[in-house]
Amino acid sequence: MEKSKNFRIDALLAVDPPRAASTQSAPLALVTSLATTVSGPGRGGSGGGGTSSGASRSCSPASSEATAAPGDRLRAESPSPPRLLAAHCALLPKPGFLGAGGGGGAAGGPGTPHHHAHPGAAAAAAAAAAAAAAGGLALGLHPGGAQGGAGLPAQAALYGHPVYSYSAAAAAAALAGQHPALSYSYPQVQGAHPAHPADPIKLGASTFQLDQWLRASTAGMILPKMPDFSCEAQSNLLGKCRRPRTAFTSQQLLELEHQFKLNKYLSRPKRFEVATSLMLTETQVKIWFQNRRMKWKRSKKAKEQAAQEAEKQKGGGGGTGKGGSEEKTEEELMGPPVSGDKASGRRLRDLRDSDPDEDEDDEEEDNFPYSNGAGAHAASSDCSSEDDSPPPRLGGPGHQPLPQ
């Protein structure tokens, strides 16, 4: 019976290793093989007593059970999820256990390099991390390093910044020992691109200055607006704002002069026709005719005064004395004195016969200056009368005294 039991145990021992190897998944086998290759220098330097490396100690649940007993190997045929998770060396411990994991990795072999790893070891660590990611991402795990001590620097080198919060000194030491091609940290990116503004405070200040300059220029502080000369200068000089002069063309002036020779006053239909033909407004035509009539009346009055002076000079040379001739002419012009009723009636008759536009023209002359030597712009008069000459004045040469 004992021989048969021993035979069965030997048979089980002979058959179990292939079964245990077959039940092992492909990613797990790849991770364990890479972990043993990375921890090779530690084994070579430690001799016979250093056969168990840091990676094998980090995978202690699987390795200890594999060497414990044949009964435990039978149980390993159907590995449970906790054991499978523990068998993966790519698991990253919690932040509180980082020191313990690093210590275990350091105690794996006395000759195992950690902080001063060569580029070959860094490449092997990166390959182990990639293999662990292939097996661990399917289970929703975060990819980490292949060994306990070197997993943290490899992860920091691949991702540029630590996933878990640990000390800045450990991060700097981990980044300093890795290959430059694998480091994507923020300080190295800053050094690789010195042309870009690295200081956000300086960038904000320059942007603020540019924004302030644009706002000030649009508000008229840096680029002042042109002043309005049409109203400000005249209001300071004359006390009121006046419109700028209308510049008539030579063709418009010729046509207006022609219409003025035909008729001194324009009716509304005629004024509308002239304004439409000359591409002017009715107000411009009206004001031009009004100012032109005032100019014509002044010139006519000046001619009459010149004729009176010439007649006075002729009469003064052939008569008695200059003073007597003047008194005589005044008496002849004025006639004998009349009673109060007749004088008042004559005064009313003179007011009725006077030109109604004369007073209006005198008022409008100050408000609307001439545009050039020929004429000016203007406001219209609605009256259309054919009288070209003003009513006779009392002192004029053509006035005769009323019969008594």
From Swiss-Prot:
- Which Pfam families does this chain map to? Homeodomain
Question: Which ranges are annotated Gly residues under compositional bias?
Answer: 41-52
GO molecular function per UniProt: DNA binding; DNA-binding transcription factor activity, RNA polymerase II-specific
Biased region (Basic and acidic residues) positions are 302-314, 343-354
Q: Where in the cell is it found?
A: Nucleus
Residue numbers bearing the N-acetylmethionine modification: M1
Q: Which residues carry this modification: Phosphoserine?
A: S78, S80
Q: Name one GO cellular component term.
A: chromatin
Residue ranges, compositional bias (Low complexity): 53-64
What is any one GO biological process for this UniProt entry? Answer: motor neuron axon guidance
Is Transport set as a keyword in this record?
no
The record's tissue-specificity note reads: Expressed in beta-cells in the islets of Langerhans, but not in the exocrine portion of adult pancreas (at protein level).
Q: Which residues cross the membrane?
A: none
Which controlled-vocabulary keywords does the entry list?
Acetylation, Developmental protein, DNA-binding, Homeobox, Nucleus, Phosphoprotein, Transcription, Transcription regulation
SMART domains, per this entry? HOX
Q: Where's the DNA-binding part? A: 241-300
Q: Which Gene3D superfamilies match?
A: Homeodomain-like
Briefly, what is this protein's role?
A: Transcription factor. Recognizes and binds to the regulatory elements of target genes, such as visual system homeobox CHX10, negatively modulating transcription. Plays a role in establishing motor neuron identity, in concert with LIM domain transcription cofactor LMO4. Involved in negatively modulating transcription of interneuron genes in motor neurons, acting, at least in part, by blocking interactions of ISL1-LHX3 complexes with regulatory elements. Involved in pancreas development and function; may play a role in pancreatic cell fate specification.
- Give the protein name, as stated in the record: Motor neuron and pancreas homeobox protein 1
Source organism: Mus musculus
Upper taxonomic classification of the species?
Eukaryota, Metazoa, Chordata, Craniata, Vertebrata
